[in-house]
Amino acid sequence: MKNMEQQHIEVVGKLGSTYGIRGWLRIYSSTEQAESIFDYQPWFLKIKGEWQSIELENWRYHNHEIIVKLKGVDDRETAQILANVEIGVDLSVFPELEEGDYYWHDLIGCTVVNLEGYTMGTVTEMMETGSNDVLVVKANTKDAFGKQERLIPFLYEQVVKRVDLTTKTIEVDWDAGF
């Protein structure tokens, strides 16, 4: 594993628990299609606060989960050390998007504010519904409306009025009571 400067790495998933005794690990992908995580290579793992490159040896589906075999990780003990480690890729491997299109990983972590200025919470994940993507927004601890989570459709211009990735803010035309 080689060290990599941190400035251009974006998290695209996370290694999960071990699978079997030969070094396989479950994987959690934050790409829109789970297997799309394999389109972006090379991978970097965040180990002790630093990104280190790693080579993917193999992957496959197992019981509706994706499991991976990383080069040099050949037993359960070595794999256990990597459990819950973030997977990143260099931003340069992502294609440029058109105006109004965003990568999910850019939206996750953004603060959502409605037009009345009420902070509705933070985007924790994205959901695909078939008709449109949905922002899953974890409400603030002491939400005035008693909400723990909000599901807000990502309809650009209709609901989502502005996305500012510099300040990590999404402005929405959405009632805080929903």
Swiss-Prot record:
Self-association and partners: Binds ribosomal protein uS19.
PANTHER family: RIBOSOME MATURATION FACTOR RIMM
Protein name according to UniProt: Ribosome maturation factor RimM
Gene: rimM
Keyword field contains Glycoprotein: no
Function, in words: An accessory protein needed during the final step in the assembly of 30S ribosomal subunit, possibly for assembly of the head region. Essential for efficient processing of 16S rRNA. May be needed both before and after RbfA during the maturation of 16S rRNA. It has affinity for free ribosomal 30S subunits but not for 70S ribosomes.
InterPro entries: PRC_barrel-like_sf, PRC_RimM, RimM, RimM_N, RimM_N_sf, Transl_B-barrel_sf
Source organism per UniProt: Haemophilus influenzae (strain 86-028NP)
One of the GO biological process terms: ribosomal small subunit biogenesis
Keyword line: Chaperone, Cytoplasm, Ribosome biogenesis, rRNA processing
Principal location class: cytoplasm
GO CC terms, sorted: cytoplasm; ribosome
Residues covered by the PRC barrel domain: 99-178
Homology family: Belongs to the RimM family.
